[in-house]
Amino acid sequence: MCGGLEAREADKVWKIYFPNPKAAIPVLLEESGQLDWIPWGRRKEEPGNGPQGGWARLSTVQSGGWEKYRPRRGFGMVQRYMEKEGRPGEKNRTSHWFDVPEGYALECLVIGEGEQQRVYIVTTAPPAEYEWIHDRWPLLTVVGTEAGCS
């Protein structure tokens, strides 16, 4: 379900981890073409109107479960993402980093406006060879193309 990301800005490499309340992702907004760093999801202790967590299941998006938040499509412009084996709370979970291919981005939903904006990474079933790591996987999309959740 990607608990960590790696993004580059000029010569700087940023490692971003969801548990950090200051976690933000560089997101290219589809409608405006503007690239902004947007806070990643909402943690349990954070106020706000968006759902808790930092992910949106593709099946829920497609069935209309996110419509009440009036999401906008975004592309998470990251170079790598990290998946951890096992379940949250388990000790000594191994991290696995995966490259995002050139020209691809993470499919994202952006909700809210201004300071209340949040980004959620769209997830789907993992590739068969990685099912043993996690049951949810970030959805990769070619930047600027139609996908299953627009």
Label each region the model flagged.
Residues 1-150:
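Short linear sequence motif anchored by a di-proline
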